[in-house]
Each structure stands twice: as structure tokens, then as C-alpha cells.
Amino acid sequence: MSDKTRLLEGKVSSVAMDKTVVVRAERYVKHPLYGKFVKKTTKYYVHDENNECKEGDVIKFKETRPYSKTKKWCLVDIIHREK
């Protein structure tokens, strides 16, 4: 894994597809005019080869080659499992 590979963390919001999970990653962006930090949420489609993620899990995922039109990320590690 090179240093330029993007690693992100997010919470799994859907596991309805085979070998794919939908992850929501939050980030804070400063408003250009008012200066307040606003929470932004981005939805990522992540490749989960063994279907090991459950809804609510917090995972770490990295950018990789495109698996499909929308899926360009793959699972690295499950940080916290939802009970």
C-alpha cells in the first residue's frame, strides 16, 4: 500500500447488495462566509469480498481500482462492530 492511497473511516448504512456495503463518512467543512464548521456526509460504495460487515459497523476502507461504475473503494478493517 503506497502513501498516496486514501484511507477513510465511516459507518455502514446498508448491506443489501452482495459483496458491497454502503458507507457514510462524515467530515467537517468551514462555511466560506460565516466561518462555522458544518458536518458533511458522503456516501461510498465499498467492496466487501466476504460479506463480513453488518449495518452499523464502523469500518476503515481505502481507494482502489474500480470494481464497477460506482464502486471504487475496498474494505481494510472493521474497527467497531455493532451489537
Curated annotation (Swiss-Prot):
GO molecular function: rRNA binding; structural constituent of ribosome
Gene3D superfamilies named in the record: Nucleic acid-binding proteins (2.40.50.140)
Keywords: Ribonucleoprotein, Ribosomal protein, RNA-binding, rRNA-binding
Cellular component terms (Gene Ontology): cytosolic small ribosomal subunit
Keyword Ribonucleoprotein: yes
Record's keyword annotation contains DNA damage: no
Domain of life: Bacteria
Swiss-Prot/TrEMBL GO biological process terms: translation
Oligomeric form and interacting partners: Part of the 30S ribosomal subunit.
Record function comment: One of the primary rRNA binding proteins, it binds specifically to the 5'-end of 16S ribosomal RNA.
Family to which the UniProt record says this protein belongs: Belongs to the universal ribosomal protein uS17 family.
Name the UniProt record assigns to this protein: Small ribosomal subunit protein uS17
The organism of origin for this protein: Francisella tularensis subsp. holarctica (strain LVS)
Recorded name of the encoding gene: rpsQ
